[in-house]
Amino acid sequence: MSLTEKDKAAVIAMWGKIHKSADAIGADALGRMLVVYPQTKTYFSHWSDLSPNSAPVKTHGKNVMSGVALAVSKIDDMTKGLMALSEQHAFQLRVDPANFKILSHCILVVIASMFPKDFTPEAHVSMDKFFCGLSLALAEKYR
């Protein structure tokens, strides 16, 4: 699913509104994912505390949103812009790429709950398309 110029503008505008809360969004989304999709805990078994408000969850949530920020900055070519992250997730971390969609959905839920007035149906569609593209870019090295 490709992003139109209108979609790109909507994503950049939404990121401008939410970026100051990115760490909180990432921590909340990752915490939700670990609770709602407990099978994802297998990737974090080396953490001593997998509870939603734990320090490792908050730290990794921040890292996730740093990746989202990178994707926003590389919105015109996320596949090329996220190649290093794709390689890391495919070859080092060995994350099932289906989990990218799961976490993307959790991020959208958190954005919608934190920014209900800004998360219009149009913004939702553009952000969903963006996260689909981001997930696809991260899965590039799995082929």
UniProtKB/Swiss-Prot annotation:
Matching CDD domains: Hb-alpha-like
Keyword set includes Iron-sulfur: no
Chain ranges of the Globin domain: 2-143
Keyword set, alphabetical order: Acetylation, Heme, Iron, Metal-binding, Oxygen transport, Transport
SUPFAM superfamilies, per database record: Globin-like
Gene Ontology terms: biological process: hydrogen peroxide catabolic process; oxygen transport
Tissues and organs where the protein is expressed, per its UniProt entry: Red blood cells.
UniProt-annotated binding residues for O2: H60
Residue list for modification N-acetylserine: S2
General remark: Hb2 displays a low, effector-enhanced Bohr effect and no Root effect. Hb3 displays pronounced Bohr and Root effects, accompanied by strong organophosphate regulation.
Homology family: Belongs to the globin family.
Role according to the record: Involved in oxygen transport from gills to the various peripheral tissues.
Name used for this protein in its record: Hemoglobin subunit alpha-2
Name of the gene encoding the protein in the UniProt record: hba2
